[in-house]
């Protein structure tokens, strides 16, 4: 099932996850809303509700209790008129194994995926270097933490996931030609880009 595959790709902290309800759009194009952290595991219904749009949009904390991740993201916060195709062309030119998704506000979420769990510090360092190489130094990097203090209630920061209400979603991945990828096409983009721990 699509929800199972999607949840496997976006594995993260099991103990908590985020939800986000959009309330209005600001002048700069960024959408504002109510973010919440739920300190409970996700269920199959949580994932299915995200993809169908019948439940809340969810966000995942990429770093797990062992301080490892299976994905990370460069969050490029440029909203109005952002040129995703230009970014895609640069990624292709540099032969980087990345998947670009449109964020909820029209910016870009640039994902690096790992087949297995990898140290949050290694992934964060790699994405920081890639961000600078792409010309977006200073962009927010997920995972934001390299170590969680779960015993102190620290669950880290979540990233809003793509493909909310996937059949009508504006939070889609981009194909190489700049067109929107369906959820099934996203799975193909993931398979083409996912790296081993050694490659990262």
Language-model features, listed with the residues they occupy:
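Short beta-strand
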Residues: 61-63, 98-105, 140-144
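DNA replication initiation on ssDNA origins
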Residues: 1-71, 81-89, 157-158, 163-166, ...
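Short, charged/polar micro-motifs that form catalytic or ligand-binding hotspots
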Residues: 64, 76-81, 109-117
